[in-house]
Design a protein with these regions (language model features):
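Short acidic/polar active-site loop segments enriched in Thr and Asp
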Residues: 1
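Active-site microenvironment of metallo-dependent hydrolases
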Residues: 190-264
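Residue-level detector of solvent-exposed, low-hydrophobicity positions
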Residues: 13, 49, 134, 160, ...
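Active-site neighborhoods of metal-dependent hydrolases
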Residues: 106-174, 230-236, 241-264
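Glycine/aspartate-rich loop-and-adjacent alpha/beta segment that forms the canonical ThDP
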Residues: 9
Length: 264
């Protein structure tokens, strides 16, 4: 059982969200802790000025994990928390410091890319929230995901199938990785220096993709399986009846094939 916190105006459908502190004051988080309900967070501070929302020295996610979430951890140390779609070294450090009661998900795009990839050529298919960050952040995410003793970090795609990604009025936030996420995670692990031809590397990827999440939530592992094969796979647009087509992330970046394929 889990509940998701979205910051006010922080994402689609969150226009009427409450400030994080309100849930500390009104007893909601305390009741969740007492009942064993997990708090999942979209960890960003909103309502910020542009220079504070995304800056080299601080950003919306760092402010949330430095100033907001620690208050909940201090007030309710038994509350189980998942930092969803983590993007910063600051967030990684907090998860590690918090210990076993805190976990985190990481998306394929945040392991593969940085804000430089987004800005160079204005690659709007890489626009998601939280935004891609800097190389030191990607390095921290990669280290956390691929570590041999990792039990707190696990896969979470946050995939968003927008049929109309960019318009004259702005850009829909979210990267579509449905059906190709395991392949992209495998690519990210290899780029992080993990040899997936060896049993140790395979075990690290398997834990991140399939074991750490269920183990952290205390649910049974899936009995279904798939096999990743180092063979290029073509990426195609998906038809959504009555709405149009969805462009998978690699195709939006001009990549018609990805390095790994999947066998069910």
């Amino acid at each position: 059982r889990a509940c998701k916190y979205y910051p006010p105006h922080g994402t689609t459908g969150a226009d009427f969200g409450y400030p994080f502190e309100e849930f500390i004051k009104n007893g909601v988080f305390e009741a969740m802790s007492d009942c064993g309900v997990v708090l999942c967070t979209h960890g960003e501070e909103h309502g910020l000025e542009a220079e504070d929302y995304f800056d080299r020295n601080k950003n919306a996610e760092e402010i949330f994990y430095q100033e907001r979430l620690p208050r909940a951890i201090e007030a309710m140390p038994d509350l189980k928390i998942v930092a969803e779609h983590l993007t910063t070294k600051t967030g990684v450090d907090l998860v590690k410091q918090a210990g076993a009661n805190m976990g985190a998900t990481i998306t394929p795009q945040h392991l593969l890319y940085t804000v430089g990839h987004l800005l160079k050529g204005c690659q709007y298919h890489l626009y998601c929230l939280p935004l891609l960050k800097f190389e030191e952040d990607r390095a921290a995410l990669r280290e956390a995901a691929t570590a041999s003793d990792n039990t707190q970090f696990f896969a979470g795609t946050d995939s968003a199938p927008h049929t109309q990604k960019a318009t004259d009025c702005g850009c829909a936030a979210g990267c579509f990785t449905g059906g190709i996420a395991p392949q992209l995670y495998a690519q990210a692990f290899e780029e992080s220096g993990i040899d997936l031809s060896q049993p140790d590397g395979q075990e690290r990827l398997k834990r991140f993709l399939s074991h750490n999440g269920p183990n952290w939530y205390g649910i049974a592992l899936s009995q279904e399986s798939f096999t990743l094969i180092k063979t290029p796979q073509e990426v195609v647009k998906l038809d959504v009846p009555g709405e149009g087509q969805v462009t998978p992330l690699p195709l939006g970046l001009g990549q018609s094939h990805i390095e790994w394929s999947i066998k069910l």
